[in-house]
Amino acid sequence: VTWHDGSELTADDVVAWWERIDDVATAAPYRGWYVAVEAVQAVDKHTVKISLKNPFGPLLAALAALRGSAIIPRALAKDRGNLGAKAVGTGPFKLSRFVQYDHLHYVRNEKYWEKGLPHVNEMTFKIMVEEDARVAALRAGQIHYAYLTGEGAARLKDDKNVSVLRSPKAWLVIHVLNSSRKPFSDKRVRQAISLGVDRQEVLQKAVFGEGSLSGPVPTGHTDWFIPVDKLPYKPDIPRAKQLLAEAGYPNGFETTIKASPQYPEFVNASVVMQSQLKRIGINAKIIQLEWGQFIKETFTQRPMDYDLKVTAWTFYPDPHHYLYQWWHSKSPSNQDYKNPELDPILEKAMASTDREERKRLYFQAQQILLDEAPQIIWYTGMNIEAVRNEVKGYVQSYTGRRIAFKRTWLEA
């Protein structure tokens, strides 16, 4: 297997991947996936040895995950600040041109390891932030593919030249409550908010009903998730007000919700939540931030600065990543929530390789999170993509993150 620049992929490149993730200076957001890894060594040119500090059930899933597992050449790994401009991979398409905020142009990788693929010789990704522009371009035949929201899909339902594709997506849209600061440090306040909101209304208004209610592990994620009919999601306004009064807030309180317009559905969900919170006396101001600033304030800086923030946990192939990564007190990605009852359950599940035991432990962990309510879980979404009818061979991905065109072609 060769890199796009012609050099050979070797075990040393895999070691460089690990060194980059393990380096504190990298501040890798997915370092928590590999907490059990002690060392990664190159045994020979094509063999890698991974040593663990302790048994780690999710290892294979973590290595297979889309995020955190991308290998790049060692030489390129040294240039951490400019990876976006010097993309080198081993995939079916090579990046030939990148015009920031405008487009990316790819050409066929003639040395791709799967013979006969890809089918097309070149491909251009246009950066089109506005959905109206994407819909119009699809209608006019200026583009062949676009990612859409439920609103955009509705506008294309009568277009005979375009097919709208749908599939469940492990995209868990949530509002995180900052459990490290008042008033959200009081469990009763968090429970009041959970009882005071209507998740079905948010699903309908934020994404036109394109999705499903969900627990801490996304609905549809093999057999790790709690069925929707078992979730404690029935709104109870009187009980919510009672809990607020017991916590010392009989008249409610003022708070803020941080969101980024990078994802319109996040803002939509926040607007609906804002309206719902008023029913129990909570007045929430929505603060919209540019995506980079949002990530800095609410994720990377310590302490994180937010009352409530809206985000999404994207696809992970193992429930460990929805539960341990965000909610174990010692995880590098912990979301300002600490629970001595939860930690040992997650540790046992992480150390086990018995699927049934892990399933039992993860169900316990999910029940604790549902009761403690450090996050308000709205829904797991839908992949909504549209293709012109001349596009053949395109298959949707459950991750919602892997857009694969190596088996796609255009029919005249």
State where each predicted segment sits:
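Ligand-site clamp/hinge motif
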Residues: T2, K111-L156, N283
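Periplasmic binding protein-like
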Residues: G6, H144-L148, S275-W327, L361-F363
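Surface-exposed binding/hinge segments that line
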Residues: E8-L9, Y30-A75, R97
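Periplasmic-binding protein-like
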Residues: L60, R155-D158, S180, F184-H221, ...
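Gly/Pro-rich hinge or "lid" segments in bacterial periplasmic/extracellular proteins
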Residues: A64-E122, E130-D132, I237-P238, Q242
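Structural transition elements
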Residues: F93, S212-E246, P261-N268
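Extracytoplasmic/peripheral linker and loop segments enriched in polar/acidic and small residues
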Residues: I280-I295, Y322-N389, A412
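Long beta-strand-rich cores associated with HINT superfamily self-processing modules
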Residues: E385-A412
